[in-house]
Design a protein with these regions (language model features):
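Conserved short-loop catalytic and cofactor-binding motifs
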Residues: 1, 29, 131
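Single conserved hydrophobic/aromatic residue that forms the stacking wall/gate
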Residues: 1-13
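Intrinsically disordered, low-complexity boundary segments flanking structured domains
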Residues: 2, 43-44, 53, 96-103
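Basic side chains
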Residues: 2, 15, 139-142
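A short linear-motif detector with a strong N-terminal bias
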Residues: 5, 33-36, 44-46, 89-94, ...
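Short, compositionally biased low-complexity segments
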Residues: 11-20, 112-119
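Gly/Pro-rich turn-and-neighbor structural signature
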Residues: 15-80
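Long, compositionally biased non-active-site segments enriched in small/hydrophobic residues and glycine
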Residues: 59-198
Length: 198
């Protein structure tokens, strides 16, 4: 196992793929900025040897795309979710080419929204190369909710969306609370919630 010892913990080692020699995420960003096509953009993403991120693409012709990036070890004997023995039975089998990670080009609904929620297609079969935890889906769901309203959105609409604070969980909680039979003083607090602008 090529890794470094963790000070003070005895025989414990850690390894981060993004610290491999030759990783050049900033150079990858430069390549992305100079890309003239979706194919060039995806090729540039292949140099993004960093922890997982979402990269999005748009061009002047109206094409849009999303590419999952980040260096991901190929683990054929374990998921990477928990620590394993350093006895040589859990070695990485290289790295998954970033270009093999999930991507979308010109989706049917004509938009794609990522707010650090899980956007990986359920059909993708290399989950240990993507991750196991994401942000709550509510912000992403709210962005999708707004974008689904139509294709005539303006720059002002986009500015408003950036500072949109509507809370989907609060709507769900109020709907649930409305079905409860409450006694005082809880009825009073529920009334307050009903007039909250989420």
């Amino acid at each position: 196992t090529r890794s470094e010892a963790v000070s003070g913990l005895g025989d414990v080692y850690k390894r981060q793929g993004w610290l491999e020699v030759g990783g050049s995420p900033y150079l990858a960003s430069l390549r992305m900025n100079q890309s003239n096509s979706w194919e060039e953009f995806r090729e540039a993403c292949n140099f993004s040897n960093i922890p997982g991120e979402n990269m999005v693409w748009a061009d002047r012709e109206g094409n849009i795309g999303w590419q999952s990036v980040g260096i991901a070890p190929i683990r054929n004997t374990h998921s990477g979710l928990v620590p394993v023995m350093g006895d040589g039975n859990y070695e990485w089998e290289g790295y998954l080419p970033i270009i093999e990670k999930p991507n979308i080009f010109n989706p049917e609904n004509e938009f794609f929204a990522t707010a650090n929620q899980n956007v990986t297609p359920s059909s993708y079969d290399k989950w240990n190369a993507i991750g196991f935890s994401w942000s709550d889906p509510y912000r992403g769901n709210r962005v999708n909710q707004v974008l689904e309203k139509g294709s005539n959105l303006t720059m002002d609409d986009m500015i408003s969306l950036q500072v949109d604070y509507l809370s989907i969980p609060s709507i769900q909680i109020i709907e649930m609370a409305n079905n409860l039979e409450l006694i005082e003083p809880y009825k009073f607090y529920l009334q307050k919630l009903k007039f909250w602008n989420n």
